[in-house]
Amino acid sequence: MAKLGIKHYRFSMAWSRIIPDGRGKVNEEGVDFYKRLVDCLRDHGITPHATLFHWDSPQALEDLYGSWRSREMASDFADYATAVVSRLGDRITHWMTINEIPSFTHMAYAVDKQPPKAPSTRVSSLKEVWQTCHNALLAHGLGCQAIRAASPSSCSVAMVADIGVTVPLTESAVDVAAAQQAFHTSWFNGGIIFPVLTGAYSPVMLEKLGADAPAIQSGDLKTIHQPLDSLGINNYTGNYIRAADNKQGFEFLDLPKAYPRMYIPWIHILPESMYWGIRHVSETLGRKDLPIFITENGCAAQDEVNDKGEVIDTDRIMYLRQYLKAAHRAISEGYPLKGYFLWSFMDNFEWESGYSRRFGITYVDYKTQRRIPKASFKWYAECIQQNRVV
């Protein structure tokens, strides 16, 4: 990391490493692991940004009450946040509560994808799926309160969202307006970032859900709508939208079969999604005051070590260069983008793909654990050194 030249590093903590039973006794050895990690980062001039939950629910709470199916999960998450921040708040001042709520609610309880084919995960109705999502939003809100209460000094609190980015097919006034309207109707947005940033679910989305909308108790929305110091956005791709002569006034466009994708089916290359995601949050939601960080952006590539011991991932460089240029456009137009985290520093375990897809700019030989900086590593280091897209 020091060789790469980064000054900020985002990582996630494992709830069950800190509190093995999900609630109750804290494992101080687990805390010590993160103390060593953070101390090493700081010794190298790297500021840590910690995400408290990145999908690894404690099995004990799954067995006890079904984890996110229960509102109890929210209060247990707050207790976990208190345990972490009270022990590490002297080292970490940048906190993120939860990463990508749809990924462990809708993608797990509705379609059995994350984690893949987890036993007894799928629930019987859409309403139950939305209830898991609502419970996670409550956890975010209670987690924000817990972080601020436990931190020994002033700190920054954020949430990380994988928003549904609606990209206008053209930048004509009618297509831009259509994309803005479509942004409201996406459940990624209307059901997640709307309550977090505005204190209410999108009326359009609630009308669409009808009886499948989650049960909302008195005070829930106030709890969810906590003051944030920034919003993290994970951006990989998006959807094209154009104006249409229908009830909605817009339509989502299917991509051609030959549309370029990276080495994973769901990442079709759409760099404009970077710009429009930032713009929609700032403009469409009326939150021009809220700093935005890109907390994930990157892609899988078919990385192979050549006979010179190198990994020449020029396709990843192409992808990153286009997305960073779109981010620069957002900054140049005055939108409050304040930082960028590349996904990822090194090859990792992907929830759907396991070790079969590589997202890192550092190649990991999983048998020997040897690390090989890829061509994209050297390119990104040059971007950092020159403080521009090269």
Predicted regions and their residues:
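Active-site region of glycoside hydrolase catalytic domains
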Residues: 22, 31, 35-390
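Catalytic domains of carbohydrate-active enzymes, especially glycoside hydrolases
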Residues: 1-14, 226-231, 284
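N-terminal substrate-binding region of glycoside hydrolase catalytic domains
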Residues: 3-31, 62-68
